[in-house]
Amino acid sequence: MSSRILTSHFSGLEEFLQQHAALLAKSTDGTVAVFANNAPAFYALTPARLAQLLELEARLARPGSDIALAPQFFEEPAAAPVAVPMGKFAMYADWQPDADFQRLAALWGIALSQPVTPEELAAFVAYWQAEGKVFHHVQWQQKLARSVQISRASNGGQPKRDVNSVSEPDSHIPRGFRG
């Protein structure tokens, strides 16, 4: 049983080595946290407290009632893969790039350090739905890769700033300027 125990009684390792019996007897709940280098090293328990914890663990491991649900209620049906339309198609709301999209983008010469975020995908889909243009699935993925690359590069690779944050001027004076 590996866990952390909340106790208000603690001791340093050296003190515990010298008077372990007295420290355990003095604790009200039968537990002492022993610290080494300002971090908990281990917990010392009285036999009575250990028996309480083991009984509690055994009780929690048993089911709370004798009613059991049939396994069919726990089995979720396998998600049917969304079929990619053949040929050219207009962008639709549930469109998703392939699972290996980052690898494909790299093959097309577009290195994406992070996967496409749901926000980036939603913006792309919304834009192209309104346009109403038709392309093949691979062409849509190439457009998405270029779109993400351009949007990320437009901010110098930095994450977008929070427009609601209050800016704070720095007090650094560049070389060559008087302060």
From Swiss-Prot:
GO BP: DNA replication, synthesis of primer
Organism this protein belongs to: Klebsiella pneumoniae (strain 342)
Pfam short name (any one): DnaT
Region named Disordered: 151-179
Gene: dnaT
Cell membrane found in the keyword field: no
HAMAP family in the cross-refs: DnaT
Disulfide bridge map: none
Protein name from the UniProt record: Replication restart protein DnaT
Function recorded in the entry: Involved in the restart of stalled replication forks, which reloads the replicative helicase on sites other than the origin of replication. Can function in multiple replication restart pathways. Displaces ssDNA from a PriB-ssDNA complex. Probably forms a spiral filament on ssDNA.
InterPro entries, per database record: DnaT, DnaT_DNA_bind
A cellular-component GO term for this protein: primosome complex
Biased composition (Basic and acidic residues): 159-173
Entry keywords, A to Z: DNA replication, DNA-binding, Primosome
Subunit note: Homooligomerizes. Interacts with PriB. Component of the replication restart primosome. Primosome assembly occurs via a 'hand-off' mechanism. PriA binds to replication forks, subsequently PriB then DnaT bind; DnaT then displaces ssDNA to generate the helicase loading substrate.
DNA-binding in keyword set: yes
Family recorded in the similarity comment: Belongs to the DnaT family.
